[in-house]
């Protein structure tokens, strides 16, 4: 088996201050600046280091199971075929088949290798759906690193399976009761820990959020998704996809897919957020749809906030999308018009969760189901037979109980 090289063709980077336009930056306590500078230096050094790249590629192949397949969803395609025989050809980038069941392992693995080279033996991370926590616990077990995971108490209840998996692999899972006990609160606690233990500890942030260099670094570790997708599309039909789709919470799986194609104007890109109980309610997580610019967790981006600038607590049936911010590069791509962002409700996501399960025998993560759900709106608008690739970012074993309770009423 050959492994796809990890060199994305897109040249877009943040500037020297870590900004994408006006978004991004480093809004952090002074105590964290040395750690961020050390991390930035390590990123620059090892991204060009042949030994590091070879080790990462070998682990992605032999441990993670890359490349992940690009699967033609025949029955889902038939579901959206019009009476005249036209309709989109739908392909799934199967990140759910990675070791640990989601895209999160790509980034966790890369950061663990960096942490080793920086001499950090203690790892902390935040998690919402539990997939990033599981991926982090996995790589810490693989490399013999001490692991502490911060997780909101509410998320621990709805993602009990992943909590057990993390503890099984030797991680300490610390419940966070502050706020609503969800992803934002877990992230805040992880940052507090990092400030206190910065000399010995590396923070494996799980999304393209946070202060520079995290949005760039996490994107680049996930860019293998888009690099593989380009090669697989060229192999299958000797061309590029017409449309890319991915769910967006913090936005790491979407950036991993989109980044490779940013400079291909023929490729339309769509990110799908969580509308929760509806964007006309206060129970949603549609940051790019309804948010305003502010600073959270070390970066400037779109945020859900009230008139006084206080963060509004988000809501989504999906723990991984239940976040009041978004990665700064997504904010930049929204304002530049390069990527379109829409939102779907809990009800629509659950219907899509069932639809993919019944039509393809693939149970998607609830996060992924949001992207699938937008096909209901998108497909009737399309003419001809465009090729759609959507990122099947994770598997849905973790969400079966949540969906069961939701359907019971």
Curated annotation (Swiss-Prot):
UniProt pathway: Amino-acid biosynthesis; L-tryptophan biosynthesis; L-tryptophan from chorismate: step 5/5
Name of a matching Pfam family: PALP
EC annotation from Swiss-Prot or TrEMBL: 4.2.1.20
UniProtKB keywords: Amino-acid biosynthesis, Aromatic amino acid biosynthesis, Lyase, Pyridoxal phosphate, Tryptophan biosynthesis
Cellular component per GO, a single term: cytoplasm
InterPro entries (alphabetical): Trp_synth_b_CS, Trp_synth_beta, Trp_synth_beta/beta-like, TrpB-like_PALP, TrpB-like_PALP_sf
Record GO terms (molecular function): tryptophan synthase activity
Subunit structure: Tetramer of two alpha and two beta chains.
Function comment: The beta subunit is responsible for the synthesis of L-tryptophan from indole and L-serine.
Family statement: Belongs to the TrpB family.
The name this protein goes by in its record: Tryptophan synthase beta chain
Species in which this protein is naturally found: Trichodesmium erythraeum (strain IMS101)
Taxonomic lineage: Bacteria, Bacillati, Cyanobacteriota, Cyanophyceae, Oscillatoriophycideae
């Amino acid at each position: 088996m050959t492994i796809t090289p990890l060199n994305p063709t897109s040249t877009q980077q943040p500037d020297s201050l870590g900004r994408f336009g006006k978004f991004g930056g480093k809004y952090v306590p002074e105590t964290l600046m040395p750690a961020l500078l050390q991390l930035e230096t390590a990123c620059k050094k090892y991204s060009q280091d042949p030994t590091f790249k070879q080790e990462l590629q070998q682990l992605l192949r032999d441990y993670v199971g890359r490349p992940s397949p690009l699967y033609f969803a025949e029955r889902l395609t038939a579901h959206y075929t019009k009476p005249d025989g036209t309709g989109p050809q739908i392909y799934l980038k199967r990140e759910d088949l990675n070791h640990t069941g989601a895209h999160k392992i790509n980034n966790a693995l890369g950061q663990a290798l960096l942490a080793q080279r920086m001499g950090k033996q203690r790892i902390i991370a935040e998690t919402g759906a539990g997939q990033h926590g599981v991926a982090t616990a996995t790589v810490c077990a693989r490399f013999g690193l001490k692991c502490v995971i911060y997780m909101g108490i509410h998320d621990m209840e709805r993602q009990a399976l992943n909590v057990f998996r993390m503890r099984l692999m030797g991680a300490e899972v610390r419940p966070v009761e502050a706020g609503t006990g969800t992803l934002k609160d877990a992230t805040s606690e992880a940052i507090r820990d990092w400030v206190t233990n910065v000399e010995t500890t590396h923070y494996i942030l799980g999304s393209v959020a946070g202060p520079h260099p995290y949005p760039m670094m996490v994107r680049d570790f996930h860019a293998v998704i888009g690099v593989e997708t380009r090669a697989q599309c060229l192999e299958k039909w000797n061309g590029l996809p017409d449309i890319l789709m991915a769910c967006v919470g913090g936005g790491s799986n979407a950036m991993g897919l989109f980044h490779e194609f940013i400079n291909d104007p023929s490729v339309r890109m769509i990110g799908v957020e969580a509308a929760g109980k509806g964007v006309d309610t206060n129970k949603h997580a549609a940051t790019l749809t309804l948010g305003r610019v502010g600073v959270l967790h070390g970066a400037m981006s779109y945020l859900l906030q009230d008139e006084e600038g206080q963060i509004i607590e988000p809501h989504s049936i999906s723990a991984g999308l239940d976040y009041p911010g978004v990665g700064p590069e997504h904010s930049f791509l929204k304002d530049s018009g390069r990527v379109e962002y829409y939102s779907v409700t809990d009800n629509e996501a659950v219907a899509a969760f069932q639809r993919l399960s019944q039509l393809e025998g693939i149970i998607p993560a609830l996060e992924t189901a949001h992207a699938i759900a937008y096909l209901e709106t998108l497909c009737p608008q399309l003419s001809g037979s465009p090729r759609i690739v959507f990122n099947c970012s994770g598997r849905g074993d973790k969400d079966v109980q949540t969906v069961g309770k939701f359907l019971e009423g």
